[in-house]
């Protein structure tokens, strides 16, 4: 099992890192480049905590249906922002909304080593409170 977060970085990132530390586990955080630029110290804290970083593109907009140049720009700007803030050159991508089609892969295959998705979704942006989220994940 792997823990992954589509997590800004945002105000919740430090709390997530603290819980991971207390439990003795790490996770992979998929960050958008614009959020990294706004919170580079938090992005660096993720790496310093021993967690892996992947990109969620630059602006977290859907890549599906975008032309080759737009896809490549979103990926490149996202990974460049992450490298600038953390020193890590990532080639992991979690496409926003899991929207990454065969043409996107062809257009970006030299920029991305793997496109990571998920198989259990906490629905955290839809649910009210931790108890409801835990129930959703465990059910």
Name these PLM-found stretches.
Residues 15, 37, 62-139:
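Catalytic domains of cell-wall/extracellular-matrix polysaccharide-remodeling enzymes
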């Amino acid at each position: 099992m792997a823990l992954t977060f589509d997590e800004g970085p945002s105000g919740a990132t430090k709390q997530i890192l603290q819980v991971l530390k207390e439990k003795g586990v790490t996770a992979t955080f998929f960050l958008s480049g614009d959020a990294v630029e706004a919170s580079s110290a938090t992005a660096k804290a993720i790496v310093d905590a021993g967690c892996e970083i992947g990109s969620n593109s630059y602006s977290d907009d859907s890549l599906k249906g975008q032309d080759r140049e737009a896809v490549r720009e979103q990926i490149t700007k996202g990974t460049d922002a992450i490298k600038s803030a953390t020193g890590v050159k990532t080639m992991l991508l979690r496409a926003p909304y899991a929207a990454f089609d065969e043409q996107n892969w062809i257009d970006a295959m030299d920029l991305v080593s793997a496109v990571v998705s998920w198989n259990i979704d906490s629905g955290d942006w839809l649910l009210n409170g931790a108890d409801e989220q835990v129930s959703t994940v465990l059910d």
